[in-house]
Amino acid sequence: MTNIRKTHPLLKILNSSFVDLPAPSNLSSWWNFGSLLGVCLAVQILTGLFLAMHYTADTATAFNSVAHICRDVNYGWLLRYLHANGASMFFICLYLHVGRGLYYGSYTYTETWNVGILLLFTVMATAFMGYVLPWGQMSFWGATVITNLLSAIPYIGTELVQWIWGGFSVDKATLTRFFTFHFLFPFIVAALVIVHLLFLHETGSNNPTGIPSDPDMIPFHPYYTIKDILGFLIMLTALSTLVLFSPDLLGDPDNYTPANPLNTPPHIKPEWYFLFAYAILRSIPNKLGGVLALVLSILILAIVPILHTSKQRSMMFRPLSQCLFWLLVAVLLTLTWIGGQPVEHPYVIIGQTASVLYFMILLILMPLISIMENKLLKW
């Protein structure tokens, strides 16, 4: 008798995606981050659902409702900090996942890559709106500053900002709609994840060598299921350690002060995972230019497949490209550090240099080095 997992209409979809899926035999731990992101999304949706049961999206009570969750709700403090630090874990996994794609040439699967970029934008939008909800000082001023950037759009900018705010400033209407969208977006993310996997399973996974692995495939279960479970345990251990020992390590102390439109914090900055983009935004002294650079800092990923000039897919056997890749990582870490610093010398010039380097590496140096490596192959 045929196994039910191969005949049942629902189970056979799951079977072909997670059990009998042919996978390359040489996938390294860098391929774990896709499944880790799935776990992060599940944790965020579950903790968020329970938090939403106790949260009130009203300027008068939002801050107090978060305090109430932490003090009076059973394990409310755990839910709140799992959700806040879960977002940090989500972005760590996201950036490592994208970095893996860049390093091993996974972006040549353009449909999967483009859906991935769309996912990145959606998750970033969700995280930004979530940061506004506790209605602390940094929530309020972060929302004001970032939404205000849209006023740089010619002709329709000001009207667009007021339309998003639902008034002439960030207020009750803004908080209510941000809560609505923050609740909705994770489900859109979940739908996009299915599309992402659909496109991935059309082509099959890439592998560290970048060479087609059709002759040497192994079933996903048990080999990669057990490997993924190990990844889950390591990540959940790290998350638990963060939540239970230093839950406020990655947060901003200003967010423990209720939002006050009459008092501006000395340094307005977003959560740590947006600091690199924020540094790029700040490094351009023109408002519209800064906004364009901010959007392009992520959107540039969409043209990476077009700029792929190498005859080899992966960077595994391309030492010069590897050096450039790690320089790019160093530049991004520098930008993250600069984003959290005040706008003064020498931080301004460091940020501007790092921003120029970031775009230069991706747009000019990577394609040129790849062409050079192609020539070296002939020698």
From Swiss-Prot:
Q: Where are the transmembrane segments?
A: 33-53, 77-98, 113-133, 178-198, 226-246, 288-308, 320-340, 347-367
Look up the signal peptide feature and give its range: none
**Keyword ATP-binding part of the UniProt annotation:** no
- Which Pfam families did the record assign? Cytochrom_B_C, Cytochrome_B
**Residues that bind a ubiquinone, according to the entry?**
H201
The cofactor(s) it depends on are: heme b
Q: How is this protein situated with respect to the membrane?
A: Multi-pass membrane protein
| Comment on bound cofactor | Binds 2 heme b groups non-covalently.
Question: Keywords of this protein's UniProt record, alphabetized?
Answer: Electron transport, Heme, Iron, Membrane, Metal-binding, Mitochondrion, Mitochondrion inner membrane, Respiratory chain, Transmembrane, Transmembrane helix, Transport, Ubiquinone
Record's PANTHER family? CYTOCHROME B
Describe its function.
Component of the ubiquinol-cytochrome c reductase complex (complex III or cytochrome b-c1 complex) that is part of the mitochondrial respiratory chain. The b-c1 complex mediates electron transfer from ubiquinol to cytochrome c. Contributes to the generation of a proton gradient across the mitochondrial membrane that is then used for ATP synthesis.
Other facts noted in the record for this chain: Heme 1 (or BL or b562) is low-potential and absorbs at about 562 nm, and heme 2 (or BH or b566) is high-potential and absorbs at about 566 nm.
- Oligomeric form and interacting partners: The cytochrome bc1 complex contains 11 subunits: 3 respiratory subunits (MT-CYB, CYC1 and UQCRFS1), 2 core proteins (UQCRC1 and UQCRC2) and 6 low-molecular weight proteins (UQCRH/QCR6, UQCRB/QCR7, UQCRQ/QCR8, UQCR10/QCR9, UQCR11/QCR10 and a cleavage product of UQCRFS1). This cytochrome bc1 complex then forms a dimer.
Protein name in the entry: Cytochrome b
Which taxonomic lineage is given here? Answer: Eukaryota, Metazoa, Chordata, Craniata, Vertebrata
